[in-house]
């Protein structure tokens, strides 16, 4: 809190601003959204609007010295858009008259270009990311859905994967990933290095790390709610592209003008045909400390693919429907032949996630709207380790993990007044989760085969009050009944966003959440040492329902392209579980129940000037865990703890060129210190008492967008990026594992981050 007070005192002298001041300003065939961003910077205002109201408006205004009201009047003359200025600070834009403005439906943005163009922070604390509008980010040639999130304060991926990131000290399985209402369980392509979702078909991402709306349940740390394209175009459009890992295609075809269209996309790796430097670098990291890396004469066949198909139907102005399908698949087939001993070994691993979603939105009147969705998600992990001698199979270790997740949700939204609305709804989900380890009778450690079902009934409601001149408040409540567990959980939610003085806002949230599905480690069971986490359901006893309580508070300062965002938080988790072998307790392989406490501060500073955007973020995190019968019942540092993390970047845009340079630095992850004696490794200093060396890397990206000619609509984009420019050798993991038997010694496994990794991208649109 001292840090917050310090920033407030430093900023108070900067708060004076004359709204009547005039500036020279001009626009030449500029997108209206870009024009609004420039006006925000110059006149220290914030625009609120619905994207559909802006359509494809472009604007040209000659250079003149104008006040804010004069600029808005000129825009109205050119576009016909109406405006209303509130409190000399907020500008409401819409197509209708002022009397018809739906304030509840407007975009309540507090920082419009958070890291870069296309990332917005809203008054409820959530972030909106629109990949099609996303500016360049360091190290990325394309707007990867999940890697973009990792640049936000408080989000860290110490293992450098796209999917296994920590949000405010929470484990990666505490993040809920949703695609068109479908819960996704797949961990990503190339064992998490690449997002499972195609960014080129993604329309919008809503990321929530605190104070989630009452409609969101199931996970403790965050929600990543991803929507594919919802607009219905009257023209056929297509895209083709490739990068150093995969190629993809996208097609959007109108079927009935303004009413019905179909969108389809397909992405596939091409490593089975041609291996690039990019793939080899990623593969070196992924397969490090595995048989694939250790044995040189093995045959490794790996590929991934995903596709999406979506129908959008708008029969009239009041109704909108969609049907969406997504499929994600990874395959690995690795074999080794020992001709001298006439033996062979084969590892086969396949992970798939197929989902189906339906949605219907209807406006019953100007004040009442309803949204109903249904989904089914099918996740499968199949692993086989087959040994043959003299061409006859001698052993087959088999691992299975399946999830059948289905549900339906309906919510009603009522605009009570110009400034307030209420939402209430019902959700039903059925989760059927199973895991099995077959033909493993010779192993000392075997997890029991299990198949559990949990049905959940949830009622939720919220009251939202929004007055841009005074305060934004959201009070919500969620009540869930877990049928098979015969348990009820209550989850209050609160969000507050309040103006203190001009340009300075106070933000606060509080929430309680519960989680019934989580991942468990079984590293000792898989010779391949990949995908060593399996999903399982709570059973109310050995695996209780996990509970989280979080509060946060901070402030936001925003003036003329200069933004500061500081947020402090405290989070408490109960009933988390851990396999004691993971903490090096060979006498018992029981699951232990524990608790975790997290305190942290996230800070962000950004400045835009003359085509440049620069930002700096800092995160402090202190996370402690305590488990019964572990570490002598004493607290120890959580494995997700990264005490200090700093990210900084500068980007520049000029016409079609974009450049970005970014640097990351963070303290190392904790690890358990070991010593060598005559019997192997021993552990006498407690759990996670050591800390890995500091991590840092420098990334670069550049893109160029162009037209092939002025006579046709064919456009192109080319990009180049380099991760870890100075090829820093970062140690990111120091762990220990057995080898399928306690009679074998415990082994030390060290893993390193990516070395210097270039990537290329080329894309065409028409």
Walk through the language-model features, giving the residues of each:
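Short, acidic, small-residue-rich periplasmic hinge/interaction motif at the N-terminus
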Residues: 36, 40-43, 79, 86-136, ...
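Periplasmic N-terminal accessory/gating domains of Gram-negative outer-membrane beta-barrel systems
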Residues: 121-173, 181-200, 204-212, 229
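Transmembrane beta-barrel wall of Gram-negative outer-membrane proteins
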Residues: 245-270, 287-331, 351-369, 416-422
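C-terminal beta-signal and adjacent terminal beta-strands/loops
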Residues: 271-277, 666-678, 704-766
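Surface-exposed extracellular loop regions of Gram-negative outer-membrane beta-barrel proteins
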Residues: 380-382, 434-439, 483, 503-551, ...
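Outer membrane beta-barrel strand-and-loop segments of large Gram-negative receptors
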Residues: 405-409, 448-460, 540-544, 550, ...
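Structural signature of Gram-negative outer-membrane beta-barrels, strongest in the C-terminal barrel
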Residues: 417-423, 427, 447-572, 615-619, ...
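Gram-negative outer-membrane beta-barrel transporters
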Residues: 570-572, 591-675
């Amino acid at each position: 809190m001292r840090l917050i007070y310090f920033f407030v005192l430093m900023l108070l002298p900067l708060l004076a601003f004359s709204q009547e001041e005039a500036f020279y300003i001009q626009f030449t065939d500029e997108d209206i959204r870009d024009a609004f961003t420039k006006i925000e910077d110059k006149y220290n205002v914030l625009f609120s609007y619905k994207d559909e109201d802006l359509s494809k408006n472009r604007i040209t205004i000659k250079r003149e010295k104008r006040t804010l009201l004069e600029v808005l009047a000129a825009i109205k003359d050119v576009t016909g858009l109406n405006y209303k200025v509130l409190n000399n600070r907020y500008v409401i834009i819409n197509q209708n008259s002022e009397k018809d403005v739906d304030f509840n439906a407007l975009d309540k943005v507090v920082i419009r270009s958070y890291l870069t163009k296309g990332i917005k922070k809203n008054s409820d604390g959530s972030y909106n990311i629109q990949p099609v509008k996303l500016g360049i980010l360091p190290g990325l040639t394309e707007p990867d859905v999940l890697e973009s999130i990792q640049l936000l304060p408080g989000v860290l991926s110490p293992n450098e994967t796209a999917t296994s990131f920590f949000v405010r000290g929470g484990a990666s399985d505490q993040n809920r990933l949703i695609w068109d209402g479908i819960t996704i369980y797949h961990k990503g392509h190339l064992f998490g290095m690449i997002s499972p979702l195609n960014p080129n078909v993604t329309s919008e991402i809503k990321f929530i790390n605190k104070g989630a709306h009452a409609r969101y349940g199931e996970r403790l740390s965050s929600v990543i709610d991803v929507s594919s394209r919802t607009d219905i175009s009257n023209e056929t459009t297509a895209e083709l592209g490739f990068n150093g890992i995969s190629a993809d295609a996208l097609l959007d075809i109108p079927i009935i003008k303004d009413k019905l269209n179909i969108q389809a996309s397909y992405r596939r790796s091409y490593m089975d045909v041609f291996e690039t430097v990019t793939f080899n670098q990623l593969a070196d990291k992924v397969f490090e400390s595995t048989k694939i890396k250790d044995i040189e004469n093995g045959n490794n066949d790996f590929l991934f693919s995903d596709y999406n198909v979506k129908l959008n139907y708008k029969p009239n102005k009041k109704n909108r429907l969609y049907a969406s399908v997504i499929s994600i698949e990874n395959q690995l087939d690795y074999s080794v032949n020992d001709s001298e001993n006439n033996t062979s070994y084969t590892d086969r691993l396949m992970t798939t996630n197929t989902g189906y979603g339906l949605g219907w939105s209807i406006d019953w009147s100007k004040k009442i709207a309803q949204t109903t969705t249904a989904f089914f998600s099918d996740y499968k992990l199949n692993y086989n380790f087959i040994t043959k001698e003299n061409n006859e199979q001698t052993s087959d270790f088999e691992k299975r993990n399946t999830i059948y997740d289905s549900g339906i949700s309906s919510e009603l939204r009522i605009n009570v007044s110009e400034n307030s609305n209420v939402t209430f709804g019902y959700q039903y989900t059925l989760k059927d989760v199973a895991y099995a380890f077959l033909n493993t009778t010779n192993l000392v450690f075997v997890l029991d085969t299990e198949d559990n079902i949990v049905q959940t009934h949830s009622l939720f409601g919220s009251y939202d009050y929004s007055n841009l001149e005074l305060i934004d408040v959201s009070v919500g409540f969620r009540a869930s009944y877990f049928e098979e567990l015969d348990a009820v959980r209550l989850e209050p939610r609160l969000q507050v966003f309040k103006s203190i003085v001009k340009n300075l806002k106070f933000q606060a949230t509080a929430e309680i959440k519960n989680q019934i599905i989580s991942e468990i480690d079984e590293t000792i069971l898989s010779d391949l040492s990949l995908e060593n986490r399996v999903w399982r359901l709570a059973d109310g006893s050995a695996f209780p329902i996990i509970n989280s309580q979080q509060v946060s508070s901070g402030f936001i300062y925003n003036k003329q392209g200069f933004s500061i965002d500081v947020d402090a938080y405290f989070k408490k988790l109960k009933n988390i579980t851990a396999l004691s072998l993971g903490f090096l307790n060979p006498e018992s392989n029981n699951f232990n129940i524990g608790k975790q406490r997290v305190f942290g501060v996230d800070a962000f500073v950004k400045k835009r000037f003359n085509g440049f955007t620069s930002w700096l973020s800092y995160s402090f995190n202190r996370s402690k865990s305590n488990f019964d019968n572990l570490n002598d019942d004493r607290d120890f540092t959580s494995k997700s703890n990264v005490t200090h993390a700093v990210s900084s970047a500068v980007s520049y845009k000029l016409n079609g060129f974009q450049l970005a340079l970014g640097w990351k630095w963070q303290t190392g992850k904790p690890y358990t210190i070991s010593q060598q004696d005559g019997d192997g490794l021993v552990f006498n200093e407690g759990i996670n008492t050591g800390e890995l060396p500091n991590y840092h890397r420098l990334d670069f990206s550049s893109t160029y967008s162009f037209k092939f000619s002025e006579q046709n609509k064919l456009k192109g984009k080319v990009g180049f990026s380099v991760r870890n420019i100075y090829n820093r050798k970062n140690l990111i993991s120091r762990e220990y594992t057995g080898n399928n038997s306690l009679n074998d010694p415990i082994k030390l496994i060290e893993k390193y981050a990516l070395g210097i990794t270039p990537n290329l991208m080329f894309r065409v649109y028409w």
